[in-house]
Design a protein with these regions (language model features):
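ABC ATPase nucleotide-binding domain helices that frame the ATP-binding cleft
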Residues: 39-42, 144
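ABC ATPase nucleotide-binding domains
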Residues: 78-80, 93-228
Length: 303
């Protein structure tokens, strides 16, 4: 299974130009600041937005190509979608919510209910089959939304901030459950998140989008070790310094000089990790640090 997507779209102030590829058994996390285009990418893949230019194919089947006048409606795409706030229908029972996607695809009511009940059993929700979503906890609501997305046997599963609606107390346990459920799904999985912890815990690969462009991609370890933009550095909790290296010294645009190790001459990026910083008072601190600066501490965040 392979997703190949080249998406070009202008939507308000957003100019989206990205290329994505995903494979079976892979969890890809899309990260980026608000307004970067992450959720819009999911909407284009799901058929909720048509691309302005580009091409989307799933397993070699083209579902969106304006040049060829091809556009498959959402219900005709082999996709499951877990929305950020789960979007469960309050007027339907839990069983009817899960069956909704099947019914929209023309599956007979009896068969849709049978398949939906199977998923309720798998996700330990059978006791809630005939209750309304209002009685569900955040974790239970997420499992219902996941069951609704998976009951149609999709090839591609889209998850938009699947843990954002949860409070801090339940987030960790639900994250563990979600990881197990994703591992049992053998299709392609694409997840939007703002949280690097979620990305590290759930994703095999990270794609960072800023201002409608992919600025970095790689494994969580690679992205964390080598942030390429200020946003990525802030995301993974390091300080990013840009400048030009000559003879082992990086000089920034403001004239600050940083001694660095193992870098060729020329423009480069350097990272300073919080655990590498030593703060002292007085005329100096005895250490083996290659760099030292004088300054005034105005605030300290205790993490």
């Amino acid at each position: 299974m392979t997703l190949d997507a080249r998406i070009g779209l202008r939507l308000g102030s957003l100019d989206l130009r990205v290329e994505l590829r995903a494979h079976a058994h892979e969890v890809v996390a899309l990260l980026g600041p608000n307004g970067a285009g992450k959720s819009t990418i999911l909407r284009c893949l799901a058929g909720l937005e048509a691309v302005g230019d580009g091409r989307i194919s799933i397993d070699g089947v083209v579902v969106d190509d304006p040049d060829a006048d091809v556009f498959a409606e959402p219900e005709a795409r082999p996709i499951g979608y877990v929305f950020q706030d789960y979007v469960l229908f309050d007027h339907l029972t839990v069983l009817e919510n899960i069956a909704y996607g099947l019914r929209a695809r023309g599956v007979a009511k009896t068969e849709a209910r049978r398949r939906s009940h199977d998923w309720l059993e798998r996700l330990d929700l059978a006791d809630f089959a005939h209750q309304r979503p209002q009685v569900l906890s955040g974790g239970q609501a997420q499992r219902v939304a996941l069951a609704r997305a998976l009951v149609t046997n999709p090839r591609l599963l889209l998850l938009d901030e699947p843990l954002a609606a949860l409070d801090a107390r339940t987030r960790a346990s639900v994250r563990r459950d979600l990881r197990d459920h994703l591992a049992s799904f053998d299709g392609m999985r694409l997840m939007v998140t703002h949280d690097p912890v979620d990305a590290h815990a759930l994703a095999d690969r990270m794609i960072v989008v800023e201002a409608g462009r992919v600025v970095q991609s790689g494994t969580p370890a690679d992205v964390t070790a080598h942030p390429r933009t200020r946003y990525v550095a802030d995301l993974v909790g390091v300080n990013l310094v840009t400048g030009v290296v000559a003879d082992g010294v990086l000089t920034t645009q403001t004239g600050a000089r940083v001694v660095i190790a193992d870098a060729a001459d020329g423009p480069t990026l350097a990272t300073i990790r919080p655990h590498s910083v030593l703060i002292g008072s007085g005329d100096g601190v005895a250490s083996s640090a290659r760099n030292s600066w004088r300054g005034t501490i105005v605030d300290i965040d205790r993490l």
